[in-house]
Amino acid sequence: VELRRTMRAAARQGGDAHHLARASARTKRRPIVVLCDVSGSMDRYSRHLLVFAHAIGRRERVETFAFSTHLTRITHLLRHGDIDAALDHVAAQVHDIGGGTRIADALHTFQRDHARRVLGHGAVVLIISDGWDRGDPDQLGREMARLRRSCHRLIWLNPLLGSTVYQPETRGMAAALPHCDDFLSAHSVEALDALGKLLADLPRRVSRSARGAAGGLAGHGGTAAG
């Protein structure tokens, strides 16, 4: 699936992406892991961003987690075809929606319980949060450093970047930022389109079938393109 066009369509159509371009079968998109902050300070953004995660999760290899004071895997909840039903399931299962924020604790739980399974094959991790955090900033820095070592690319999406006066000076954001490959906004269609372009431009993984074909060519004295 052509990721950038899928993401743009999802953003513009409120989560539905029906018109898709197909990418080459010889390469595969990197898996995406979404860690979405659903704490009280993110109330005005959470639904919009979960709609977006729902849309790309139906078309791409995506694992999605929600966090506030605890981490909850919601991948299976977002697979429901109807977005309103999917979000109702999320609201019923994620018991700390609208609560405080413990980003470091959420990352620790993710890396202890889920990272080995979902960070293979050069995954790209998207953390969606405003960076307001009640935890220990030093712990957050350590967890971010560990996460960065485990993934292909670590991207932080902060909806507050849509404001021209915003500065990432909270303790949590300041601790996390040095470990991010990219620091982007997530407040508008245009911001999500920029994210789609970034992800679409990342080097793809060569599929197993393509590697097998390349090996066959090499065995017969041919040359395969990388």
Regions found by a protein language model. Give the residues of each.
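Negatively charged sequence features
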Residues: 1-30
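Short acidic, Gly/Ser-rich segments with clustered Asp/Glu that frequently serve as metal-coordination loops
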Residues: 33-47, 71, 132-135
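Cofactor-binding loop segments of dinucleotide-utilizing enzymes, especially the Rossmann-like FAD-
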Residues: 67-69, 130, 159
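Exposed acidic/Ser/Thr-rich ligand/metal-binding surfaces
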Residues: 104-153, 184, 194, 198-207
